Amino acid sequence: MSETKTEKATFGAGCFWQVEEAYRDTPGVIETAVGYEGGHVENPSYEQVCSGNTGHAEVTQVTFDPEQVSYEELVEKFWAVHDPTQLNRQGPDVGDQYRTVIFTHSDEQAEIARRSLENARQRFRDPIVTTVEPATGFWKAEEYHQCYLQKRQEQGGLLGMLMGR
């Protein structure tokens, strides 16, 4: 029996809880993890990243089977799950850790992401501020952040969380 060949995709699109939830049940996605990428501090804590002094973005790293879901499809979902025209914010979350960014793991991914960015520019009225950058090091966030919204479903999901349940 042959082992499944997997690839990684890393997306910053605001709060990593919502981004992870958007990808978690996608067919072909094997695993998701939330963490930090793009900064200058090794293994930063959530508090450090939120201070705005580390340069990291909150990201979701997706491990996927390219025979079941293509990188192109994952990038298309990226455009659908957030507003790529908002600079350093998504909704009420403000700060450069919430920036819109695609971190690529290969030259092929970089080419696909850039081409997708050009196509997306034709679909949005306002200028897109998303950057495409090479992945330089993913730091997994604290365990309580992993599958955060899924863990809260027993307590009424996101609505329950917002209502203090």
Language-model-derived ranges and their functions:
Residues 1-165:
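Flexible coil/turn and secondary-structure edge motifs
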